[in-house]
């Protein structure tokens, strides 16, 4: 039995992959609920939610926060500061920290997956211009797609924030994080007015980022117009996907030779898909919101059986 953990912005998603028959069970724990629980209670709710016993687990693959403090897949006992350079960026609730610590103290074999950032070894060196490209659960999404038989692809995870990643010949070559390109529902890039607000002390940089999404930023004329917000989200997500197409073309992969996937709470909506398909000129495929957790479970399984490299990320012995 192998378990994957997706530390999302709103909730923490879990997936268990059984060896016999490949049966998958999934469940989601809200970060706010997790923060109220102790370590043993968290392990028990994982057992109940996934319909497993801890003794059955061969390996867990865990993601946490930005994952920018390391660049190889590590045993949880060898990760410093939970694998992050700082806890001050992004949505801070405390539930993910509780889950990390619960698994670290549980005795269950656990590995931690890094994010994609300037320290990543195999990404395009030009992408290292940005300190951070994608958080660790996006590696899980990419592996979920890879295990379906795709080696050249792009995916956009459109939810609280938007992150788009490209993979060429089974190697992650680049990604664009929420603070760089397309906004999400709640989080987004910091523009000129937000820079002024930060400089004037009206808002912190983290709060500015956390309220720069299409549903939180004060940009809609008059009353809230959700259709305009979704149209805006689709446009910028399509532009970000197109940017990844340019990167892949530089590797000799035309858009017609690759596949584009959508996931996330907004990405899985039919109207968002239709808009993006029209704008990019491709037929995208929608993934389950549990794709990151399932992909992480697949990583756990393959590492357990000796995999030394996952999508260009080395596995520490």
Please tell me what each predicted stretch does.
Residues 1-27, 150-175:
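Gly/Thr-rich phosphate-binding beta-strand-loop-beta motif of the actin/hexokinase/Hsp70
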Residues 5, 60-62, 109-115, 134-136, ...:
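General beta-strand structural signal in soluble alpha/beta enzymes
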Residues 53-130:
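Short beta-strand-loop/turn "lid" adjacent to the catalytic site in phosphate-handling enzymes
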Residues 122, 126-152, 169-225:
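Glycine-rich phosphate-binding loop plus the immediately following alpha-helix
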Residues 130-139, 156-160, 284-292:
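Active-site nucleophile and cofactor-binding loops and adjacent substrate-binding regions
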Residues 203-255:
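Adenine-nucleotide phosphate-binding core of ATP-dependent small-molecule kinases
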Residues 253-276:
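Glycine-rich phosphate-binding loops at beta-strand->alpha-helix junctions
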Residues 267, 274-275, 282-317:
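Glycine-rich phosphate-binding/hydrolytic loop that grips phosphoryl groups
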């Amino acid at each position: 039995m192998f378990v994957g953990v997706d530390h999302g912005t709103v909730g923490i998603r879990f997936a268990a992959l059984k060896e016999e028959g490949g049966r998958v069970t999934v469940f989601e724990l809200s970060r706010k609920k997790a923060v109220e629980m102790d370590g043993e209670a968290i392990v028990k709710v994982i057992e109940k939610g996934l319909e497993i016993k801890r003794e059955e687990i061969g390996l867990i693959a865990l993601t946490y926060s930005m994952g920018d403090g390391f660049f190889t897949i590590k045993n949880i006992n060898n990760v410093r500061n939970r694998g992050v350079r700082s806890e001050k960026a992004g949505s801070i609730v405390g539930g993910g920290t509780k889950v990390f610590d619960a698994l670290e103290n549980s005795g269950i074999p656990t590995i931690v997956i890094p994010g994609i950032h300037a320290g990543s070894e195999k990404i395009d060196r030009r992408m290292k211009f940005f300190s951070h490209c994608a958080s660790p659960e996006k590696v899980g999404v990419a592996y979920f797609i890879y295990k379906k038989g795709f080696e050249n692809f792009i995916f956009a995870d459109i939810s609280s924030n938007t992150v788009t990643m490209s993979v060429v010949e089974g190697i992650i070559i680049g990604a664009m994080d929420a603070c760089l390109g397309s906004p999400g529902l709640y989080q987004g890039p910091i523009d000129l007015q937000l820079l002024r607000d930060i400089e004037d002390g009206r808002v912190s940089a983290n709060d500015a980022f956390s309220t720069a999404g299409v549903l939180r930023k004060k940009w809609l004329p008059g009353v809230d117009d959700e259709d305009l917000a979704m149209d805006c989200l689709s446009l910028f997500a399509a532009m970000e996907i197109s940017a990844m197409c340019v990167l892949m073309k530089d590797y000799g992969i035309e858009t017609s030779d690759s596949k584009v996937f959508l996931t996330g709470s907004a990405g899985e909506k039919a109207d968002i898909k239709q808009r993006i398909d029209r704008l990019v000129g491709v037929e995208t495929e929608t993934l389950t919101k549990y794709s990151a957790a399932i992909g992480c479970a697949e990583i756990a399984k393959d590492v357990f059986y000796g995999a030394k490299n996952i999508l260009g990320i080395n596995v520490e012995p």
